[in-house]
Amino acid sequence: MARKNQKAPWEPEEEYILVSKSEMKRDMDALQKLGEELVELKPSVLAKFPISEELLDAIKDAQRFKNEARRRQLQYIGKVMRQEDPEPIQAALDKIRNKHSQNTAVLHKLETLRERIVEQGDSAIDDVVALYPDADRQRLRQLARMATKEKQANKPPKAYREIFQILKQLNDDAVSDSIENELKQ
C-alpha cells in the first residue's frame, strides 16, 4: 500500500494525451497538403514566409521536379514540416489568399461603377467624383458618351475599357495616399 504522501504506482505522474494512429496520419497529410500549397507559390512570395532554410530548399527542389520525384519530395516536405510550427505558415498563406479575394472584390466594385457611369451618366459621375476627388469629370463624361456610341454601333469597347482603367488608377492612387497618411501618423 502506498503512503499518503506518495502516489500509487498505477497513477501516472504526468497526464498523457493519447493520439490515435489515424489522427497522426491526418495531421501529417494536412502538413503535406500545406507543403503542396507552398510549392505552388512563386519564389518571390515564398521568400516572405516564416520557414527554415531546409524547408525552403526542399520546396525549391520540389518546384523543379516532375511526377514521381515530385511526389517523393512532397512527402519529404511533409516530414520537414513536422519539425516546424505550421501556424505562422498557415497564417501567412491565409493572408495571401485574403489579399487576392480583396483585390477581386475591388475589381468587381470598379466594374459595377463603370456600368453605372455608362448607363446613368452624370449622376454616377458625380458619385465617382465624390469618392475620388481627383477624378476628371469632363473626361469621364466624354468617355461615357463615347462608350454609349460604341455600344450602339457595335464597335470594340475602347472607351468602356478606358473608363475602367481610369477608375482603377483613381482607386490605386487613393489606396496609396491612405497608406502614406497612415505611415505619417
Swiss-Prot record:
Compartment(s) where it occurs, according to its Swiss-Prot or TrEMBL record: Cytoplasm
Pfam families, A to Z: DarP
GO biological process: assembly of large subunit precursor of preribosome
GO CC annotation: cytosol
Keyword Protein biosynthesis: no
SUPFAM superfamilies: PSPTO4464-like
Matches recorded under Gene3D superfamilies: PSPTO4464-like domains
GO molecular function: ribosome binding; rRNA binding
Keywords assigned: Cytoplasm, Ribosome biogenesis, RNA-binding, rRNA-binding
Highest taxon of the lineage: Bacteria
Keyword check for RNA-binding: yes
InterPro entries: DarP, DarP_sf
Principal subcellular localization: cytoplasm
The family this protein is said to belong to: Belongs to the DarP family.
Primary role: Member of a network of 50S ribosomal subunit biogenesis factors which assembles along the 30S-50S interface, preventing incorrect 23S rRNA structures from forming. Promotes peptidyl transferase center (PTC) maturation.
NCBIfam families in alphabetical order: PRK05255.1-1
Protein name: Dual-action ribosomal maturation protein DarP
Organism from which the protein derives: Vibrio vulnificus (strain YJ016)
Gene: darP
